[in-house]
UniProtKB/Swiss-Prot annotation:
Biological process according to GO: response to hydroperoxide
Gene Ontology CC annotation, any one: cytosol
Annotated family: Belongs to the UPF0246 family.
Domain of life: Bacteria
Protein name: UPF0246 protein BURPS668_1321
PANTHER family: PEROXIDE STRESS RESISTANCE PROTEIN YAAA, PEROXIDE STRESS RESPONSE PROTEIN YAAA
UniProt cross-references to Pfam families, sorted A to Z: H2O2_YaaD
Native species: Burkholderia pseudomallei (strain 668)
Annotated InterPro entries: YaaA (IPR005583)
Length: 260
């Protein structure tokens, strides 16, 4: 079983990693090709492309200039420890043991606009490039065209090593990022957990809580060494509970009445 997550825009390069083990991104050459094209943009063009402020545009202009094809602990950090958004607060990888991180390395993947597909311990250099960015490039009109079927083929290569009920992709990524995967080409069942909170008289998806819950689900999978979709139904972190009546074979709905 493999669980896929979205990345985060917020990054932490201040906190030293608590593990030294690291790996190299599979699609580093593709990332370098994108960086070469991004370096042609001015800060103003970056700001317009990404709809970000002038200071953020200048920051990312400098990040692209500083980016190196060679990722080392001196210029990069393990992805799961560098990402710092809501999903990663739920995952809280900094508190995972080395054994937990080793399991995550085999079962967790992060979709990325720049890197395509990352393992938790792949070295990540600072960047910002959301998958939905309409960045025209040598391969097409946007990043979905750039990545094409590459991410899907990479996931299939890993899923083929899993047997039986464990040949499952758990989609804990956003719609923007999961669009880079071609489910019809996947040699696996896809299960999507959905997290809803009670508000204004009904259950609804609240973005902040849903993002955090995706990270909590990934942590549950890692700590529990979960390798079958049925075991996902026992997830009960921070008040969530599986609701069979709202779920089906492909979508597992978890609900809670009050905030954690």
């Amino acid at each position: 079983m493999i669980i896929v997550l979205s990345p985060a825009k917020s990054l932490d390069y201040e906190t030293p990693p608590h593990v030294s083990h690291h790996t190299q991104p599979q699609f580093a050459d593709d990332a370098a090709a994108l960086i070469d094209e991004l370096r042609r943009l001015s800060p103003q063009q970056i700001g317009t492309l990404m709809s970000i402020s002038d200071p953020l545009a200048r920051l990312n202009f400098q990040r692209y200039a500083d980016w190196s094809r060679a990722s080392t602990p001196a210029n990069a950090k393990q992805a799961v420890l560098a990402f710092n958004g809501d999903v990663y607060e739920g995952l809280d990888a900094r508190s995972l043991s080395p054994d937990d991180l080793d399991y995550a390395q085999r079962h967790v993947r992060v979709l990325s606009g720049l890197y395509g597909l990352l393992r938790p311990l792949d070295l990540l250099q600072p960047y910002r490039l959301e998958m939905g960015t309409r960045f025209s490039n040598a391969r097409g009109k946007d990043l979905y065209a750039f990545w094409g079927e590459r991410i899907t083929h990479a996931l299939n290569a890993e899923l083929k090593t899993r047997v039986g009920a464990s040949r499952v992709l758990v989609n804990c990524a956003s719609a923007e990022y999961f669009k880079s995967v071609k489910p019809k080409l996947l040699d696996a069942r896809v299960v999507t957990p959905v997290f809803e909170d009670w508000k204004d008289g009904r259950y609804k998806i609240i973005s902040f809580h849903a993002k955090r819950a995706r990270g909590l689900m990934a942590r549950y999978v890692v700590e529990g060494r979960i390798d079958s979709p049925d075991a996902l139904k026992d997830f009960a972190s921070e008040g969530y509970a599986f609701d069979a009546s709202a779920s089906n074979d492909d979508t597992y709905v978890f609900r809670r009445r009050a905030g954690a």
